[in-house]
């Protein structure tokens, strides 16, 4: 936040616009179509303290102006670009166009529209909604300094075997049985920060950050599942999270359990349903919450 000393108080302030939804369609050189849908949030750090303490709005960028800018800049983008590049583009505009703005924070969530295939062929203009979401946040200072973070939200992963949980603390409150055979499911949230520290250092390759996002998603999924024919055993969500994290240079991971509880039902006459690793009750409340961050001392993304 922009910090001031006002009337003997430390005063932090910022203002912005949230949940600006924009979709952009491009016609490709090959004649097909491409679409993105973004939810944009903007925060501006600026020299507008007078609007708070002296009823003077002359230094304020109206939040409605910020909203309009999102659509105007989307219109100006004649080529397909990544969510990271659009976040940087917006932030760069605000710090360069307005002398009052000292820093801009732009965060974007991309809705996962995926091209459909019909009869094994990619459709020219047909898309379906996927699940996991690509996120990005760009923080740009007046000096051109940059902090760029990308992420994944809602990456749901499940394997029906090759998981267990044994050897944990047992006391008078423990009811959970140990097992070396269970289903493992989670919804991954991941964040990673790039090492580019200025606007002038970011790669100019088209869709560079989209390619990196797809690489990270693939490594996370491949590490979780293991080889296709044999898989890989998971002794705990914690261990699997660590193995997924250490495949990257620097990353934060959050992996709550999505529980599939064994179903055993009986009455006075005997079993109605006897569990044999086959019938489960899915539930996500309450759930375990496992998270960690890992950063190599010698490397950055």
From Swiss-Prot:
Enzyme class at the top of the EC tree: oxidoreductase
Record-level Gene Ontology MF annotations: urate oxidase activity
UniProt-listed Enzyme Commission number(s): 1.7.3.3
Function: Catalyzes the oxidation of uric acid to 5-hydroxyisourate, which is further processed to form (S)-allantoin.
Record: residues binding urate: 63-64, 165, 182, 237-238, 257
Identification of the protein by name: Uricase-2 isozyme 2
Recorded coiled-coil stretches: none
Pathway: Purine metabolism; urate degradation; (S)-allantoin from urate: step 1/3
Catalytic activity line of the entry: urate + O2 + H2O = 5-hydroxyisourate + H2O2
